[in-house]
């Protein structure tokens, strides 16, 4: 019983296959090629290419499939991308239906010039072409029910308006807009053939700077002054790969910024080394900025990478200005202020010593004369102007006090009074020398700027990086 039913089912299902095989053999048989030729001639005879299928009736439904071969280039400068694809359209034309041969007919690509085809075009196309090696890459396939499958291998460069505010941490949406040029929705309708499976090959695409995160298929109608037109949109969501920019832009900028801090560990009086290092790092950052601007369009807003390079440039430039500040404090403003203070102290000391000598030396036992003191002060000023500012303190050492012995005998009372007077003068000179020493800038005060810079610059730069990456990555 079951065997009989099984054999019956096998006979029912195998009958169409047997018929198809017989027909295929009959078609491929050279003796029956005349039948195929007569069928094609009959279909093309009287066919009017100027009229769409079902002219005057319902609109022609055109289904579309896209098999993406590659995305060759995404250009930020030109705001476009280049796509190579197999573009297929299918519609039904009752004028091309046949029942003599129950098989599909794949015809020569030149037959497409004798049939009606949709006036499809790419709305955001800049430049497109159909491949022609070794012959024009077109396909025409007819089905017995009149369905026509029309395929093309196309390379198109389509416009893609990009928002580069977050470049190179950005995501872009690039679309391919497909539309009918002349036929309105009263004559033609577009739809994605196979719904979500209408576009294939996306997952196989590999781009050097981007990753395809997602894609969407959109069907809509657009209204112009000439009527309503069908439109299909294929939208790619592209995420830029940051690896290239880490190696080519971010890491060099970070290393150059850190290199500019080396000057904080170089001695303050090594002007040639510190200035050369600062200028070199500034020029290197300028070169990186210039190279980056050449690879991007001239846009009116600031990009994320501009913010980072600008921040690095500021840190490098501030490191150069830091040495200018140290140099000015030690070799500029400091010595001028020290010289003025030394002159005031010397003048006051000379005047007071002259008055005291005139009043308290009846026995002609005096300190160094005013002329000798002035000469010694002039010598100290010359030393201060030519050498290290610390050397000015040497002019006021107590050992420079000299006495001139009188030729006349002295009483013990006068000797004691003179000794007390000399002791007072020595003490006063020591105090003057101590005050002058205090006004001289210590090297530790100048080096403190470098010590603070060694901490301040890395901390602020680290904070800048944390804020930058948290903001643009999230």
From Swiss-Prot:
GO terms for cellular component: chloride channel complex; cytoplasmic vesicle membrane; dendritic spine; GABA receptor complex; GABA-A receptor complex; GABA-ergic synapse; glutamatergic synapse; plasma membrane. Glycosylated. The gene is Gabrb2. It is a multi-pass membrane protein. The chain crosses the membrane at residues 245-266, 270-292, 304-326, 452-473. This is Gamma-aminobutyric acid receptor subunit beta-2. Heteropentamer, formed by a combination of alpha (GABRA1-6), beta (GABRB1-3), gamma (GABRG1-3), delta (GABRD), epsilon (GABRE), rho (GABRR1-3), pi (GABRP) and theta (GABRQ) chains, each subunit exhibiting distinct physiological and pharmacological properties. Interacts with UBQLN1. May interact with KIF21B. Identified in a complex of 720 kDa composed of LHFPL4, NLGN2, GABRA1, GABRB2, GABRG2 and GABRB3. Allosterically activated by benzodiazepines and the anesthetic etomidate. Inhibited by the antagonist bicuculline. Potentiated by histamine. Beta subunit of the heteropentameric ligand-gated chloride channel gated by gamma-aminobutyric acid (GABA), a major inhibitory neurotransmitter in the brain. GABA-gated chloride channels, also named GABA(A) receptors (GABAAR), consist of five subunits arranged around a central pore and contain GABA active binding site(s) located at the alpha and beta subunit interface(s). When activated by GABA, GABAARs selectively allow the flow of chloride anions across the cell membrane down their electrochemical gradient. Residues 1-25 form the signal peptide. Residues 327-451 are cytoplasmic. 4-aminobutanoate binds at residues 181, 226. Disulfide bonds join 160-174. GO terms for molecular function: chloride channel activity; GABA-A receptor activity; inhibitory extracellular ligand-gated monoatomic ion channel activity; ligand-gated monoatomic ion channel activity involved in regulation of presynaptic membrane potential; transmitter-gated monoatomic ion channel activity involved in regulation of postsynaptic membrane potential.
């Amino acid at each position: 019983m079951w065997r009989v039913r099984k054999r019956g089912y096998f006979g029912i299902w195998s009958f169409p296959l047997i018929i198809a095989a017989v027909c295929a053999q009959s078609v491929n048989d050279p003796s029956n090629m005349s039948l195929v030729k007569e069928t094609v001639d009959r279909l093309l005879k009287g066919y009017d290419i100027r009229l769409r299928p079902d002219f005057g009736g319902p609109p022609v439904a055109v289904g579309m499939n896209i098999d993406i071969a590659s995305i060759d280039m995404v250009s930020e400068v030109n705001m476009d991308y280049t796509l190579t694809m197999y573009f297929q359209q299918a519609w039904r034309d009752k004028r091309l239906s046949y029942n003599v041969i129950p098989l599909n007919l794949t015809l020569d690509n030149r037959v497409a010039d004798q049939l009606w085809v949709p006036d499809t075009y790419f709305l955001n196309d800049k430049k497109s072409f159909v491949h022609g090696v070794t012959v024009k890459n077109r396909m025409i396939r007819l089905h017995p029910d009149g369905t026509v499958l029309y395929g093309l291998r196309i390379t198109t460069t389509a416009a893609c308006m990009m928002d580069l505010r977050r470049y190179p941490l950005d995501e872009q949406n690039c679309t391919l807009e497909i539309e009918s040029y002349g036929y309105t929705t009263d004559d033609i309708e577009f739809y994605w053939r196979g719904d979500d499976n209408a576009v294939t090959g996306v997952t196989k695409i590999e781009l050097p700077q981007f990753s395809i995160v997602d894609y969407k298929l959109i069907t809509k109608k657009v209204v112009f002054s000439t009527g309503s037109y069908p439109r299909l949109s294929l939208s790619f969501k592209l995420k830029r790969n940051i690896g290239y920019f880490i190696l080519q832009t971010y890491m060099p900028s970070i290393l150059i910024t850190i290199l500019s801090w080396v000057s904080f560990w170089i001695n303050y009086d090594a002007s040639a080394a510190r200035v050369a290092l600062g200028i070199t790092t500034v020029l290197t950052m300028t070169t990186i900025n210039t190279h980056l601007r050449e690879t991007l369009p001239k846009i009116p807003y600031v990009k994320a990478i501009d913010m980072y390079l600008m921040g690095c440039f500021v840190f490098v430039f501030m490191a150069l200005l830091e040495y200018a500040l140290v140099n000015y404090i030690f070799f500029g403003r400091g010595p001028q202020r020290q010289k003025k203070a030394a002159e005031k102290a010397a003048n006051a000391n000379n005047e007071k010593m002259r008055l005291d000598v005139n009043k308290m030396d009846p026995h002609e036992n005096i300190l160094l004369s005013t002329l000798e003191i002035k000469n010694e002060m002039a010598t100290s000023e010359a030393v201060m102007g030519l050498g290290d500012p610390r050397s000015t303190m040497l002019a006021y050492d107590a050992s420079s006090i000299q006495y001139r012995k009188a030729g006349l005998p002295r009483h013990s009372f006068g000797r004691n009074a003179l000794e007390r007077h000399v002791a007072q003068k020595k003490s006063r000179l020591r105090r003057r020398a101590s005050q002058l020493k205090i006004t001289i800038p210590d090297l530790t005060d100048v080096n403190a700027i470098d010590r603070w810079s060694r901490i301040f610059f890395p901390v602020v730069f680290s904070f800048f990086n944390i804020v930058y990456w948290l903001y643009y990555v999230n």
